[in-house]
């Protein structure tokens, strides 16, 4: 969506239906965020029934309505997957996909009490959004609808999707069964594969990203899968490179830009610590960079030494990295929050005691952080 807005010079109001299924359901059902189950509700439910339920987290969509579900509770995951797959909790439990030794009686209690809790407090969860939308017949009528990443839809989401395209003149369903890696999370790729006999197929046979060596490796793996759509998929012209490393420490990432993928979030945290030790700057969507504020403070300080005035917020951010020897901070309380301040004025009127480079001035930043930031800059 953001790329479309930028590329075609649009606003958010120009694309009211460029959104996830959950976001569409949230909007058309006229819901408010305080009507949706949050972490505090699951915690409260656990205290009411006498044992911890764990917590549920929803990765937020661009409008804050949420989309992907994750939880540290295997009980909640079983309940979630049963809904996504249109089966009972008994059937999901019998699949034995959970990793812990769980009590079915506890599962039944949590499932029943969760339903009662939502009813008593007039709350819904994100699965309820999809189910309520499908039952409501509130889908707008479109001339054309595009459903992207369709291989990742669950049976429950397929029902919602059909309720949309049944009111649509033309429907384009985009996806790739070879990229269906979320079956464990409830995705029903079989529904996507079945569409090839119901719709006109418009295959994209030329990749513009995958070089030949990577393509060869990928095809050697994917061709072992028996139940898949047979397709022609050509690589880019360039050969590319393929290297195997058994540890992230052996990869030289000191030059260029790198994209690092991992199976789980905690693995990214370990990799981030390795990059941090090497003084390599990185961004992780799940974790704020340790030195983001320090980097902003150092940049503002360097600009101030060159004569650029500082805002009150910049002064606040800079001052927290200085000890009492470098800044008598009590005088900061007399500053006007809407004003700007030159470094000489800060020395004269507001307690600043030093005018040297940031890595010498920031005596309370911590040497490890300072060393990291100096390598990065």
Identify what each model region corresponds to.
Residues 1-34, 216-219:
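P-loop NTPase Walker
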């Amino acid at each position: 969506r953001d790329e479309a807005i930028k590329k075609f010079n649009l606003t958010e109001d120009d694309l009211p239906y460029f959104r996830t299924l959950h976001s569409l359901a949230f909007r058309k059902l006229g819901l408010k965020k305080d009507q949706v189950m949050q972490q505090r509700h699951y915690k409260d439910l656990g205290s009411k029934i006498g044992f911890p339920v764990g917590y549920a987290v929803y990765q937020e969509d661009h409008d804050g309505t949420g989309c992907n579900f994750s939880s540290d509770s295997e009980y909640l995951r079983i309940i979630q997957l049963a809904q996504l797959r249109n089966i009972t909790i008994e059937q999901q439990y019998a699949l034995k996909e959970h990793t812990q030794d769980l009590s079915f009686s506890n599962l039944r209690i949590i499932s029943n009490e969760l339903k009662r809790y939502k009813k008593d407090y007039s709350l819904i969860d994100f699965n309820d959004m999809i189910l309520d939308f499908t039952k409501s017949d509130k889908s707008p009528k479109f001339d054309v609808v595009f459903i992207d990443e369709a291989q990742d839809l669950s049976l429950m989401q397929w029902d919602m999707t059909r309720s949309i395209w049944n009111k649509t003149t033309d429907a384009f369903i985009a996806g790739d069964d070879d990229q269906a890696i979320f079956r464990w999370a409830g995705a029903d790729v079989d529904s996507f594969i079945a569409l090839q006999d119901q719709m006109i197929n418009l295959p994209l046979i030329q990749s513009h990203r995958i070089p030949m060596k990577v393509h060869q490796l990928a095809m050697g793996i994917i061709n072992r899968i028996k139940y898949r759509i047979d397709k022609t998929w050509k690589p880019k012209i360039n050969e590319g490179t393929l290297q195997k490393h058994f540890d992230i420490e052996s990869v030289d990432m000191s030059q260029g830009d790198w994209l690092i993928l991992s199976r789980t979030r905690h693995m990214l945290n370990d990799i981030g610590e390795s990059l941090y030790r090497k003084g390599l700057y990185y961004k992780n969507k799940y974790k704020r960079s340790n030195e983001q504020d320090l980097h902003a403070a150092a940049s503002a300080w360097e600009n101030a030494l060159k004569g650029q005035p500082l805002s009150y917020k910049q002064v606040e951010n800079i001052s927290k990295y200085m000890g009492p020897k470098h800044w008598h901070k009590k005088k900061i309380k007399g500053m006007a929050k809407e004003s700007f301040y030159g470094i000489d004025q800060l020395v004269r009127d507001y307690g600043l005691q030093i005018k040297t480079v940031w890595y010498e001035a920031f005596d309370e930043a911590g040497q490890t952080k300072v060393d990291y930031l100096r390598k990065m800059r």
